[in-house]
Design a protein with these regions (language model features):
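Juxta-kinase regulatory segment immediately upstream of eukaryotic protein kinase catalytic domains
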Residues: 2-36
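ATP-binding pocket architecture of kinase catalytic cores
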Residues: 39-200, 204-206
Length: 206
């Protein structure tokens, strides 16, 4: 196992700062997740913690829960509702996305908004050159990756119910403005190079 595998793959006990009311979650799942039946065990995934991610397991099923982190958040950051909406829409168009079981935007359940999706087994390849695989296996993975990307770009976002998702046009301008504001909101000290970059980017955006 590589150092990256050991650090970022698998699960660990839930960190104290990220624990929540398990009984409240079980009540919500009983009401909103078809086929759910406890008892439930909860572990925290080692990686992917911009939005804390948990593995939920019962005697008959496994799920993944992603939630907003607790505490004060920057505006528009950690929008788990957007993740849920896009993956649900793509899955309904036949794209290989995990099944979405439900979204909860009621902070009173476990403290922050969250959604629950199916747990899907998979492999993580840290090196894009795939040096440990046979040439024919590498070729198959690259071909599958290209086919999946082509499938994604072939989906009609209007037909998928995402016609009102985001704002059309001026993506770079809006992104630069949003991230500049968020940087300033989180700034703890003045960094001249960053201020210069914030001034430079709008003038040179594609």
């Amino acid at each position: 196992m590589s150092q990256l595998d050991d650090t970022y793959t698998g699960t660990k006990p839930v960190a104290d700062a990220l624990k929540f009311d398990q009984a409240a979650l079980e009540r919500w799942m009983q009401a909103h997740v078809e086929g759910f039946a406890g008892p439930l065990t909860i572990e925290q995934f080692k990686g992917g913690q911009s939005n804390p991610t948990y593995k939920l397991e019962t005697p008959k099923a496994r799920y993944v829960l992603r939630r907003k982190p607790p505490g004060k958040l920057l505006p528009s950051a950690h929008a788990v509702d957007r993740e849920y909406r896009v993956m649900k829409a793509l899955g309904e168009q036949g794209f290989p996305a995990p099944h979405m079981f439900g979204l909860c935007e009621d902070d009173s359940v476990i403290g922050t908004a969250f959604y629950i999706m199916d747990f899907v087994e998979g492999r993580i390849f840290w090196d894009p050159y795939l040096p440990d695989l046979k040439p024919e296996d590498r070729a198959a993975i690259y071909d599958a990756s290209n086919a999946t990307l082509a499938h994604l770009h072939s989906i009609d976002h209007e037909a998928a119910g995402l016609g009102d998702y985001g704002k059309p046009g001026n993506y770079f301008e809006r992104s630069i403005g949003r991230w500049s504001k968020q940087y300033k909101a989180a700034e703890t000290q003045t960094i001249a190079a960053m201020d210069k970059l914030i001034e430079w980017l709008p003038e040179h955006a594609p």
